[in-house]
Amino acid sequence: MAKVGKLTKLKSAMKKWPSFAKNHHHSTSSAAVSDELSEDNNLHVVYVGQTRRPYMLRPDIISHPLFQELVDRSSSRSIEQDREIVVACEVVLFEHLLWMLKSGQEGGSVEELAEFYTY
């Protein structure tokens, strides 16, 4: 009987999935808005992972040596277009990296950490 309940929950989640994906789709107009926001707030758009998830980052994060090493390693694996900053890193790991940089809990050498975070 427990399997039936799990299957029902799974079906329910699968039905909601398409509407969830539609709500989180970025259009070119939203990209233009994010460009305007980045200019106004001095934030930079960074695209992370294979899905190219956008992040708005402050200049102090962008200029950090570890972040610069990630961008350098990523640029050899991806094609940069129109000044876009692309980081070849899993999104979950990138969020951990941001937490480390913001909290000042960086440990280890820049090269070792960059190798850990990039794919």
Swiss-Prot record:
By its UniProt entry, which InterPro entries does this protein fall under? SAUR_fam (IPR003676)
Any Pfam family from its record, for instance, is: Auxin_inducible
> Which keywords does this chain's UniProt record carry?
Developmental protein, Ethylene signaling pathway, Growth regulation
Q: Which GO terms describe its biological process?
A: cellular response to hypoxia; ethylene-activated signaling pathway; response to auxin
The job of this chain, per UniProt, is described as:
May be involved in the regulation of ethylene receptor signaling. Promotes cell expansion and plant growth.
Q: Which family does it belong to?
A: Belongs to the ARG7 family.
Query: Miscellaneous notes for this chain?
Result: Plants silencing SAUR78 exhibit increased sensitivity to ethylene, while plants over-expressing SAUR78 display reduced ethylene sensitivity. Plants over-expressing SAUR78 exhibit increased rosette diameters.
Protein name listed in UniProt: Auxin-responsive protein SAUR78
Q: Taxonomy-wise, where does this protein's organism fall, top ranks first?
A: Eukaryota, Viridiplantae, Streptophyta, Embryophyta, Tracheophyta
Underlying gene: SAUR78
